[in-house]
């Protein structure tokens, strides 16, 4: 989190103070937003008195280290299962709670809220990415470009968000079904 001086550019002002906020493997877009808001508020309260008494020396930003983040859109959430299991799991976490990651199941949008990279997934028989390779009582396993992703929490179009074990009470996807 950075507290900076405003100038005419977009996020180009001098840096006043910064604080590193760790991102865990369980963080979602929503939980990270909350963490950053909390850290930013605390940092601002620490910075204002120092700014007022002149004990802060502004630091010019190094433009070579800057990056641009494009706006989030719903289309960004469409899962391409040909990617790596790790990248897809991170996409799902990053887009939780908006715009959310999704695929298609039986012609309907299926939002995926929680997943994890399946253990020993490289031992699974390779299928076309997006193919359901296994269904258990509480999980659906989907082939990705380099392994298998275990779906844990989903939401079918027009329904509420639920654990996969609850989804499976009303739906019986079969191994071999292709999502997308």
Residue ranges and their predicted role:
Residues 67-70, 141-143:
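Short, flexible, solvent-exposed loop/turn segments with mixed acidic/basic and small polar residues
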């Amino acid at each position: 989190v950075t507290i900076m001086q405003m100038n005419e550019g977009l996020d180009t002002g001098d840096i006043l103070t910064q604080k590193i906020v760790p991102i865990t493997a369980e963080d979602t877009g929503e939980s990270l937003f909350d963490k950053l808001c909390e850290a930013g508020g605390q940092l601002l309260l620490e910075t204002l008195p120092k700014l007022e008494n002149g004990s802060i020396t502004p630091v010019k930003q190094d433009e070579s280290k800057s990056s641009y983040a494009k706006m989030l859109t719903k289309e960004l959430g469409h899962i391409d299962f040909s990617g790596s299991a790790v990248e897809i799991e991170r996409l799902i976490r990053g887009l939780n709670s908006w715009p959310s990651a999704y695929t298609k199941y039986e012609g309907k949008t299926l939002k995926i809220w929680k997943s994890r990279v399946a253990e020993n997934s490289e031992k699974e028989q390779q299928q076309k990415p997006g193919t359901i390779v296994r269904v258990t009582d509480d999980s659906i396993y989907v082939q990705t470009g380099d392994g298998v992703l275990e779906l844990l929490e989903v939401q079918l179009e027009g329904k509420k968000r639920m654990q996969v074990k609850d989804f499976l009470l009303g739906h019986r996807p079969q191994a071999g079904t292709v999502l997308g």
